[in-house]
Amino acid sequence: MKNLSEFDLVKSMVLMESEMMSIKESILEQLIIEGVDDPGILKCIFMAGGPGSGKTYTAKEIFGVGKGDLDSVSATGLKVVNSDTAFESQLKKNGIDPKDLGRIEKEEPELWDKITKEPGGIRDRAKKLTQMQQSFYEAGRLGMIIDGTGDDFTKLKKKKERAEDLGYDTYMVFVNTSLEVALERNKNRGRTLSDELVTSKWKVCQENLGKFHQLFGGNFSIVDNTVYKPVDKAVQKVINTFIRKPIYNKIGLKWIETARLLKKNNFIK
């Protein structure tokens, strides 16, 4: 494992930020142009479930993520927002095997804190990079799949409220599995966590399940993923209907009206 020196960390993070800042204003304008008539425009779907629940597998089954497209784009046109992708990439660039995280948490607590908790650390910067990516999608009100664990109810509630303030209609897909299966899958993941952390997050997610159902109301589906299998057709149909139906959010409807007016009058070229 390469020594995670402060110089290497800073250099890596600067390169990340430089890469994102290279996106010009013209691209943001293009996002808005695409967003007006995008099939998944102003639809925000939250994926929740503990580590090892199989959210990535479920996203592929429901939305076609990674099937003939980039992993950041689904067949439905929705953009995937997942900080784990940037996190794992940066771990590898810094010479850390993601499968070693469980061991590092137990045996190298100082390095673990530096990676996951330190301001400017790999996890912190990966989240900031993902937030920048998400802001570009939001500029064009492009549809999004926000992938997370769901172990922090308050944080997810705030994300939902923010999306709705921007004009998005929101939905949640909660991917559920037994603790035993989650622990077994964790051992075979590309990024392995400690059994204690998986168990802790799984329990909190279970406690939050009812709260999420109440928060999202009818825009909520549970996918039992204890055994890998095709998603239930009824669940697939409900989610497809949500993506395709007209925008309900009044803020979103106003944004579409304004964006089309700007486009018509060549304010956006």
Model-based region annotation:
Residues 58:
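Hydrophobic positions on the alpha1 helix immediately C-terminal to the Walker A/P-loop
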Residues 179-269:
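Conserved GTP-binding G-domain of TRAFAC-class P-loop NTPases and closely related GTPase folds
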